[in-house]
Amino acid sequence: MKISLTLSRDQAEVLARVAFIDKPIFNNREQRVHYSLMREITVKATRFYMGFTMQKYRKFWLKAYEADLLEKFIDHTLKVVEYGTYERQTLFQIMYEIDEQLA
């Protein structure tokens, strides 16, 4: 099952910046697996953002497990890191779209 998110260039930039994991901490096997998956999502989001040539909306495709992990990651990040109004609104919109399609 695949999930599609329709994003503008600015929204794709927010997603690419938020999905980037700076300094991972590995305490167990589960965290190493999650980091590996998030790294794949980060690469996919960054390539999607870099592929924009104009400000039109494009579809960003994720597999169900990638979308689920991204939703959990964004939810956790919003609780820990403070973002501006536009970034928070964009991240909540992405979480809502993922939740609607996975439900």
Give the positions of each predicted feature.
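Positively charged, low-complexity terminal tracts
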Residues: M1-A103
